[in-house]
Amino acid sequence: MAVPKRRMSRANTRMRRSQWKADNVALQEVKIDGQTVRIPRRLVKAAQLGLVDVEQF
């Protein structure tokens, strides 16, 4: 495991952490009950089975 040679200051630690950014979720077009909706890919199967309400998307 990597071990730092020197202590990192609080300012530098927070600056490094602040550079992390979340990506937008890729949406996929799916036809459910005759209407086309764009939902995340991981929810497609649940939406087709009726486990997820697609009205909120």
From Swiss-Prot:
SUPFAM superfamilies, per database record: Zn-binding ribosomal proteins
GO MF annotations, alphabetized: structural constituent of ribosome
Family affiliation: Belongs to the bacterial ribosomal protein bL32 family.
InterPro entries: Ribosomal_bL32, Ribosomal_zn-bd
Organism the protein comes from: Corynebacterium glutamicum (strain ATCC 13032 / DSM 20300 / JCM 1318 / BCRC 11384 / CCUG 27702 / LMG 3730 / NBRC 12168 / NCIMB 10025 / NRRL B-2784 / 534)
Keyword Transmembrane helix annotated: no
Domain of life: Bacteria
Keyword Ribonucleoprotein: yes
Listed GO CC annotations: large ribosomal subunit
Protein name: Large ribosomal subunit protein bL32
Gene Ontology terms describing biological process: translation
Swiss-Prot/TrEMBL keywords: Ribonucleoprotein, Ribosomal protein
